[in-house]
Every structure is written in structure tokens, then in C-alpha cells.
Amino acid sequence: MYLEVSERQVLDASDFAFLLENSTSPYDYGENESDFSDSPPCPQDFSLNFDRTFLPALYSLLFLLGLLGNGAVAAVLLSQRTALSSTDTFLLHLAVADVLLVLTLPLWAVDAAVQWVFGPGLCKVAGALFNINFYAGAFLLACISFDRYLSIVHATQIYRRDPRVRVALTCIVVWGLCLLFALPDFIYLSANYDQRLNATHCQYNFPQVGRTALRVLQLVAGFLLPLLVMAYCYAHILAVLLVSRGQRRFRAMRLVVVVVAAFAVCWTPYHLVVLVDILMDVGVLARNCGRESHVDVAKSVTSGMGYMHCCLNPLLYAFVGVKFREQMWMLFTRLGRSDQRGPQRQPSSSRRESSWSETTEASYLGL
């Protein structure tokens, strides 16, 4: 959240590894003396006090909810792992990504409340891990959307031949791209001592141009492109489902709308604030201390809304997805009868079929 006057711009990563926007000075500290402004950096008391109070409480709550909710989703899917469709497999990877993301939240809660006490190595790992799973969540939702689009709109199953191999390769590509986008975290993140704060924080050592370019990349690749893919695919899916008949199809349509709307509602406010900050960086909008303080607080609040998306998907499955509730109940029943010879309520072959390539019925989670 701060800039250190040096040959390189140093950014605090208290808003996590992928949030490079919390620059609190309007001045570009370059390598040349002429780059320095005669005015001092903006005071940070208001935004700092807000972050120290708001972020640790929020991150702790999201950690508990996200771990329990996504753990339940993973348990349900793994209990049916021999009959998972392509959508179910993507959802399993999405739950894993959300779990790994929320596991970093306690570290960043400590960083926001006190300082970074976990060393430079864990700084790089935690920052990269958060960034990897931020991208993975968006990319996997886009994969689910495209898979449903082909299966419903074009009646095409791209995973019909060797489905597990093809789905696995798709997931490997997704995780590989996420790792590629997280390389700046491994390179530029470090635990740096900030003299103005008298504290050590997990920070980026970034030149201004690199900071702006990476934030634009994250805005486009991590939000706009996945959102456009989801909107396009689900708009065509809804067009097909609306002309169909049957209550089952309308239940599937309802959850489709809710899932894509949740992604948009959770992440749009944050990325709009980031866009404003980018426009101030490039000089399109004037930067002053009052506006900068408001933007910093807005980023803390809206980023919290974005992180809530990790906890929201399991709730959507539970309250909107009928099949998820059924499978969760069956899992609890089997666990309660583990001392018996076997579960008495195994789903029939017709109920176990979850791929939309053969039917518009939802997967195990109702998608």
C-alpha cells in the first residue's frame, strides 16, 4: 500500500499478491533525480487504520467459510469420482483452487494487522499461490461455460473420446497459464522493511511502467475475458433452454444465471476501482491525496467482495442446486453407516449420469 523512495517503486502486498494497485503516492520515483516531486507522499493514516481493522476480520471469516464450503464441495465430488462428468471435474478443480486461495488469507491478515513475519520465501510462495488460484477460478468458470455451450447449443461433446484424458489436459493447461501469470510474484515479491511504517511487509519491487502493465493484464485476462466468455456462452444456453419444456431445464437455467451473476457481482466493483486507479497512473484522471485515500479504501472494500466469491459458490450449490443437497445428504448417510456392509442409497445409473452432453440435467452440483 506504500511507496518507498528508492530507485525502484516498492508496493505493499497487503491486498494480496495480485493486487498491485495500492500505490499511495502520486509521484513516479524513477531512477533519475528529475523524476522526484518536491511534494511529500500522501499521508496514509486513514486507509491504514481502516485496513488494520477491516481486513483481518474479513480474511478470518472468509478463511473459515471458504475452507468449510469448498471442502464440502470437494468431498461430494470425490465421493462420486468414478462417474464425474467434464463439468464435475472442472468444479472439483475450482473447489481446490478456492481452498488454496483461502489458505493464504491468514498470512495476509497478519500482514495487514501487524507486519509480514513469515520471511521472504513464504512471501513469494503465498503471493504466487494467491495469484495462481485467483486466475484459476476465473479460467475454470470460463471452461465450464464453454463446455456447457458446446454440449447444449451445438450438441457437441469435445470430451466424448478419452474424456478423462482430455479434461485432465485442459486442467493442466489452465494451471500452467496460471503459473505463468504468477511468475512476477516469484520474481518481484520480497519481504521489505518500510522505514515510514517502521514495519516489514510483503512488497513488490516494481518500476511504475511494469506495475501499470501487470495490472492491465490482470484486469483483462483475469476478469474481462473470462466474463465475456461466460456471458456469451450462457446467453446462448439460456436462449436454448427458454424454448425447451420441462421443469428440470428451468432449474438448470436458474443456477446457470446465478453462478455467472455471482462472478460478475463479486468482481466488477473491484475491477472498476482498479480501472480508476490505472487511469490516475497514466494521467487520464488527476491524482490527489483525497482521491487517492478514497480509492485505497474502496479497493479494500471491493477486493473483500471479490474474495467472497470463493465462499459463495458452495452456498449457491447448496441453496439452488437440488442435486448437490441430495449428494451431500447421501454422503453424510454413508459416513453414518460406515460400520455397515455398504451404503443403502446408491444412485441409480440414470441418476449418476451427470454430463450435459446426453441431457440438460445438471452435474452433481446442479450446473
UniProtKB/Swiss-Prot annotation:
Residues 1-52, 110-124, 189-211, 277-297 are extracellular. GO terms for biological process: angiogenesis; calcium-mediated signaling; G protein-coupled receptor signaling pathway; inflammatory response; negative regulation of execution phase of apoptosis; positive regulation of angiogenesis; positive regulation of cell population proliferation; positive regulation of chemotaxis. It is found in: Cell membrane. The chain crosses the membrane at residues 53-79, 89-109, 125-146, 169-188, 212-232, 255-276, 298-320. One of its GO terms (molecular function) is C-X-C chemokine binding. GO terms for cellular component: cell surface; external side of plasma membrane; plasma membrane. Keywords: Angiogenesis, Cell membrane, Chemotaxis, Disulfide bond, G-protein coupled receptor, Glycoprotein, Membrane, Receptor, Sulfation, Transducer, Transmembrane, Transmembrane helix. It comes from Mus musculus. This is C-X-C chemokine receptor type 3. The gene is Cxcr3. Residues 80-88, 147-168, 233-254, 321-367 are cytoplasmic. It is a multi-pass membrane protein. Residues 338-367 are annotated as: Disordered. PROSITE patterns: G_PROTEIN_RECEP_F1_1, G_PROTEIN_RECEP_F1_2. Its main location: membrane. Expresses in lymphoid organs and Th1 cells. It comes from the Eukaryota. Sulfation on Tyr-27 and Tyr-29 is essential for CXCL10 binding. N-glycosylated. The lineage of its organism: Eukaryota, Metazoa, Chordata, Craniata, Vertebrata. Disulfide bonds join 123-202. Receptor for the C-X-C chemokine CXCL9, CXCL10 and CXCL11 and mediates the proliferation, survival and angiogenic activity of mesangial cells through a heterotrimeric G-protein signaling pathway. Probably promotes cell chemotaxis response. Binds to CCL21. Upon activation by PF4, induces activated T-lymphocytes migration mediated via downstream Ras/extracellular signal-regulated kinase (ERK) signaling. Homomer. Forms heteromers with ACKR4. Interacts with PF4/CXCL4.
